[in-house]
Amino acid sequence: MTFIPVNEPLLNGNEKKYLCECIDTGWISSEGPFVKEFEQKVSEASGRKYGIAVANGTAALEVAVQALGIREGDEVIMPTFTIISCAMAVTKVGAVPVLVDSDIHTWNMDVDEIEAKITPKTKAVMIVHLYGLPVETDNILALAKKYDLKVIEDAAEMHGQTYNGKPCGSFGDISTFSFYPNKHITTGEGGMVVTDNEELAERCRHLRNLCFKKDVRYVHDEISDNYRFTNLQAAVGLAQLERLDEFVKKKREMGRYYSNELRNIKGLILPIERTDYAENIYWVYGILLDRDIKSDNKTLQKLLAEEGIGSRTFFWCMHEQPVYQKQGMFAGETYPNAEYLARKGFYIPSGLALTQEQMEYVVCKVKKIMTQLY
C-alpha cells in the first residue's frame, strides 16, 4: 500500500466550478463577491451576526485579541496544552498568557483551575476546544460574568460541532476559526473571526486591512498587518461548507470505526466518544499511550512511518516552548496532565479522503506495533 498521509482533504464538490468562476471573472483578490458570501454563511452556521475572513487561524486569533483591546501587561488565561498560535496572539501585544492544566479525560483545559488564576490584571479567558470535543463552556462564561472578563473562543477545530445544542463559535465576545487543510472544511489557508458585536466586527475589518484610515487610501492611523483573505480561498470554502454535515457524519463514522477496532488494545487510551454536552466530531483521531509504556509518541510516529503511515504527535505545552523559556516565562511551572498528553499523545490518519481499506491497514499496523511495545 502507498503511504497514507495523516490528513488529506476531500475536494470533489463544487471547488473547481467556483474557482473557475473567479478566474473567468478576474475576481481573485480580497475584493471578490465570494468573500462576503463565505463570511455570511460561516457566521450564520456558527450562530453569529458578523464574520470577518482573514488569512489563517493564527491571524484570526491575533485580530480577535487586538480588537478586544488587550494590551501590554494584561493577562489572558488559556490552556498550556494548545497550538502556539494562541499564546503568540497574546504575547504579540505584550500581554501575558496565564496557563492552566488539562483535563485528562477530555484533553481540554481544566475549567476548575481557572478561577484561582484570576488576578486584577486578568482581562480575558481564551477557550480552546481541542481534537473534536468542546470545552465545558458554561462554567467559563459564568466566571467571565462574575469577574467582568472578555471571552475569546478558539473554535479552529470545531466546524459543525455543538455544545449543548448551540454551535461552537457562538460563545463569548468573539470566536475564531481556521480553514487549514486538516480542518473539517478547508480553504488551503484561511481563518475567520465571528462576533455578535457590530463595533468589534468593524474593528476586526480595520485591523485586517493594514488599518487604512476610513475613506482615505494609503493613510494609516495605527500599526496592523495585512490579514486579507482572497476570493479564490472563499470559492473553495463555499464549496466545502455546502458539505459540512456530510463531512461531520463521515468523521464520526471514522471515529467509531477506529474506536471499535482499537478499544481492546492493551496500552492505548482512546478519545471520549461523547460527554453530557457534546458528541465527538473527531477533528483528528487522537490516541494516548498508557503511562506504563516506556515509549513516547515520537517512537510511535517513527514506527508508523516505517509501515507507510503518517501520524502526528500532540501539541507541545506552552510552558515548555523554548521561545518562551528563553524569555524567562513560565519558570518553575509544571502541568502534569498536559505534559503527559504532549509526550504520549498522537493521532493517526483521519482525513476526509481516507478510505475504508486504508483505515483497516492502519488498524492492523497499530495492533502490530502495540504488541511489540507492550
Q: Which ranges hold each PLM region?
A:
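PLP-dependent aminotransferase-like
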Residues: Q66-A155, T162
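Histidine-centered beta-alpha loop that forms part of the nucleotide-sugar donor binding/catalytic region
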Residues: F81, A95, S102, A156-E157, ...
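Phosphate-binding glycine-rich loop
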Residues: I28-E75, M88-V93, L99-D101, K166
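N-terminal "arm"/small-domain region of PLP-dependent enzymes with the aminotransferase-like
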Residues: M1-I28, P349
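Conserved active-site segment immediately N-terminal to the catalytic lysine
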Residues: E153-T187, V216-D221, I269
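Structural detector of well-ordered beta-strand residues that form the stable sheet scaffold
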Residues: I52, I77, V98, V151-I152, ...
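Active-site PLP attachment segment
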Residues: S170-N209, N231
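PLP-dependent aminotransferase class I/II
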Residues: K36-K41, A45-K49, D112, A116, ...
